[in-house]
């Protein structure tokens, strides 16, 4: 290494450089060390690689120098013989980036550790952390870059059999070793389950799963959601909505309409609210312009009659059209198009009153005015809409004034007629008010159909009030004329006139879009706004989030997902609001709040992009459709039985004749499991389902004609659709999607969908079918789909008492006895204390009696806690920390038991040395020098198994390896 360094310095050396630098005072000052020395040679002593500080950036020779040099980076080599240490030119290759992470280490890898002992130790500990019983890497260097991986919680590593033998006596027998190791593994599992239960028993998500009271309440709530969904589905099934749609991607609009209908019904909507689905969907950019447009429309409607908005409404009143443009349609029209098109409408309205010679001037004036308006509209702001709109109307040309004047002169007579009709309505209202304490509101004809509907509702209310007044006693009715004689009648008529005037003014104001919107309009209950919460601590409850969200108007519900171990048991949440709220403002205010010192990470949740998504088109084939019907029926029966949807008490009214079907039809099914379809279940979707499960084939015809199936397998056959089977399958698929939130063609379930922003959001449908399909493809598809849906076919069976006893189940009476003993303290002879109340007794039996009488609620809490823990153990899919990677790989392989259901271990027997290590030189050299028997010691018969050989082709032949 020294020769190469010298060669490097020789090539870079300048012959007279040292002499030039010696006569430059500034360079001499730079060459001096910080401590101040007379000669640059004073710093040579600092080049000792073992005298540097930990802050040095160099490698093995990292001394604390003011100006690092190339020699600082090349290790503890000899110092250069020529040249100055303060070289200006940078080195050819700098090694510092490789050592930059040394600041993150408690002990630097280089400098103080020339033999890399610490680095080897870190690497050993990270790969073999089983000896330290740690679930995280012990090295700061390895844990710093991988923060996400280090946060993943796992169980501590379980001792391997080899490590467990190190803790036992050397004279222990093999059977005793295996017995103790089995007990160790059982105790280890019990301890992990108990620790996990204690860590999460106070969290809401855990209580909703296993607490004896909270879990029952949660299950009843979910069952209520399912019953509500079932009622909605039956309603849609009866009115033909379900039967009129097919689950094909080509009918995406119809499927979306069915899903939206379900959502509106689930939200408590009526048939009137379903009319919102007939309106055209509002595009996103138009929705953002609605706010400025509505304010502008209200300003225009309150102006003088030269407003174009007013002329349009008066035009509708003049022509007595039964339908008026709805406010939604007006809001969908852009502002520019509204101002550009009103001149053409005025031309049509004022055509009889026009002068023939003014046509050209009107057109030219209108064109100029349009150009001016467009320029002004680009320059104005939203704050001065009123002033700019007024200025635009005042800048009309003379021809426009004549045109508008002619138009409004025609309409003045109509206004006079309307005033006369209004006066008649006032007189009629005054006459009716004499008999009614509440005067009815008289609608104006200018309001169109929207106002007529409102007037009809008010008239119905007045009729109801009249009926109530007619039912009053005769004494109260006799008092009314007496009161009228005393002078109350003129006061009442004056009040009625004032009220009718105010109502008439209100009716004229309802021409505005905002006023019309306040009338009875269909509600878009299927559209919501929502906020997504990225981080929710496990300790945060749903009630705390609801307390924050109820302060905002339009709050509907909140949904919280189950925690994930990958996210350190943090959860995600969705907050749902109505569509008309300012969701961004609410999201901003939520981001400025912290709940239990946790940033929720609120962001605006976008709407669903594609609600109907295509699945494989091969699903439309007749054979696959029949297999899907069978699978859907099994899934529906399993889920109905799990939630007890169609029990005898709930279904007696819905299907009274279900049991009257002959049992002989059960033999028509394929297999014994198909006999339960439509007979044991009261579900109308499963009625007569066995008729569609019978497979049909022309086997005899093919045999007689000699038609072989080889040609079909090679070339394939076209897709065969059976519309009758497809209609049955679609009814089952929609039942699973609407009632149980199971997307069949996506083979998944959407959990807690009733609390999500979209209650029926996404559905997968059959895509476009291929041209041909082979029988092999059909069989593979059916088999693969059956495997994907096994999670819905398997029944959830809880563990038995014997099984949970092995996991450490607790006995309620035993735990109560422990509770009594823990609260019985002996102070002195014949002097005992109860810590629960602080009272003293003469004996423990008195404390026991006192606890059961005065602290019965504490005893009940102990019993509930025991049931709480046992419910957690009974769940076969209970949440728990994942096993340590080392434990999961070596637990069964090195135990020597070889239980069924596991792969055969790939390691040698537990007493053999691992691969890659040489055997001990002495007989007793194994396992730390202890005197163990030879490596190939015999095991008892119950633990012996056949050894499986793994031969290396390059290794020499060893014939007696498995003797």
Swiss-Prot record:
- Report the SUPFAM superfamilies cross-referenced here: RNA-binding domain, RBD
Which Pfam families has this protein been placed in?
A: ARS2, SERRATE_Ars2_N
Which terms under GO biological process does the entry name?
primary miRNA processing; regulatory ncRNA-mediated post-transcriptional gene silencing
Subcellular localization(s) per the UniProt record: Nucleus
Q: Which InterPro entries match?
A: Nucleotide-bd_a/b_plait_sf, RBD_domain_sf, SE/Ars2, SERRATE/Ars2_C, SERRATE/Ars2_N
A single GO CC term for this protein reads: nuclear body
Q: Which residues form the signal peptide?
A: none
The molecular function GO annotations come to: nucleic acid binding
- Give me the stretches of Low complexity compositional bias: 73-87, 129-144
Entry keyword set:
Nucleus, Phosphoprotein, RNA-mediated gene silencing
Question: Where are residues bearing Phosphotyrosine located in the sequence?
Answer: 82
Which PANTHER family does UniProt cross-reference here? Answer: ARSENITE-RESISTANCE PROTEIN 2 (PTHR13165), SERRATE RNA EFFECTOR MOLECULE HOMOLOG (PTHR13165:SF0)
Please state what the protein is called. Answer: Serrate RNA effector molecule homolog
Q: Which organism is it from?
A: Drosophila virilis
Q: Lineage of the native species?
A: Eukaryota, Metazoa, Ecdysozoa, Arthropoda, Hexapoda
